[in-house]
Amino acid sequence: MVEDDPGLQSQLKWCFTDYEVLVAEDRASALAQLRRHEPPVVLQDLGLPPDAEGVSEGMATLEEILALVPATKVIVVTGHGDQQNAVRAVAIGAYDFYQKPVDTDTLQLIV
């Protein structure tokens, strides 16, 4: 999971207790985890530091994840009713998207 919000990290770890959950809070740590573990599924927030209010860092992270391990299924998690950027992420290669606030049952179904 690539998420900079510690509260949401905890919620998602709790939601996916049946899975091995790796946590990254920014692009550098996400790419390091990806190289080390090559997870089949990545949940990724589009609003990542240093551009936590925008999506440029999240989109760049998505592109790099897919370039490194193209088979990875990336599910982008967006906030603020940002469906336009979620659709853009799917066009880049994201597997699916989910809008915050997170409903854990629905997110488990997507994964």
Q: How should each PLM-predicted stretch be described?
A:
Residues Q44-D45, P49:
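Active-site T/S-Asp motif of two-component receiver
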Residues A32, A52-A71, R88:
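Short amphipathic alpha-helix used as the core "switch/output" element in two-component signaling
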Residues H80-G81, I92:
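Short, conserved "switch-loop" micro-motifs in signal-transduction and mechanochemical regulators
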Residues D5-A28, R36, V41:
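Two-component/phosphorelay signaling modules centered on CheY-like receiver
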Residues Q84, Y98-V111:
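C-terminal output helix
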Residues A28-R35, E63, Q108:
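Alpha2 helix of the CheY-like receiver
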